[in-house]
């Protein structure tokens, strides 16, 4: 699953990234049923995807369920691989990829959690009706990346491990400035 009409929807409604990022976080403000006042999906991360990317929703759902079964934090994040370049880290050269997405990223994944999160207005060229991002810098540490895709009319998956790095603030800003920083 992917939202095949994503670009068309951008002309019809504001970006939903901020709401999706909050819903994809276990610790979030309560959302109540207007009829009963009952808190909906309390202490649960609701996997979200807001991209046309093939199988993005399926990947988020499978990952969320797997993490819960393993007793791990169930929040998931969809990222685009923007670019990569060498960087000197601890006296040796590492190739550092920039993963970035405007929304659906839970504050749980950010340095400082909610304190490290910000929302920026989506650029008018992408979302004329507005809407906010949910932005932050990823916590350093081990990550698992995955993608699910269709090849030769069959569903396939790739999985891997990587490490999110703590870069100096000025390097983080420089890398953000090379893309759409919002």
Go through the PLM ranges and name each one.
Residues 2-182:
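Anaerobic metallocofactor- and corrinoid-dependent redox/one-carbon enzyme cores
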């Amino acid at each position: 699953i992917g939202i095949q009409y994503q670009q068309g929807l951008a002309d019809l409604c504001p970006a939903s990234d901020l709401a999706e990022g909050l819903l994809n976080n276990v610790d979030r403000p309560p959302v109540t049923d207007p009829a009963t006042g009952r808190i909906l999906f309390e202490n649960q991360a609701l996997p979200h995807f807001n991209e046309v990317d093939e199988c993005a929703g399926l990947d988020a759902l499978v990952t969320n369920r797997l993490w819960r079964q393993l007793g791990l934090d169930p929040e998931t994040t969809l990222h685009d691989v923007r670019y990569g370049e060498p960087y000197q880290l601890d006296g040796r050269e590492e190739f550092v990829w920039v993963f970035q997405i405007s929304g659906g990223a839970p504050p749980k994944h950010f340095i400082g959690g909610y304190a490290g999160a910000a929302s920026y207005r989506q650029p008018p060229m992408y979302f004329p009706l507005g809407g906010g991002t949910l932005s932050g810098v990823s916590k350093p540490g081990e990550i698992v990346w995955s993608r699910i895709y269709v090849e030769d009319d069959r569903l396939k998956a790739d999985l891997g491990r990587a490490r999110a790095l703590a870069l100096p603030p000025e390097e983080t800003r420089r890398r953000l400035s090379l893309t759409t920083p919002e």
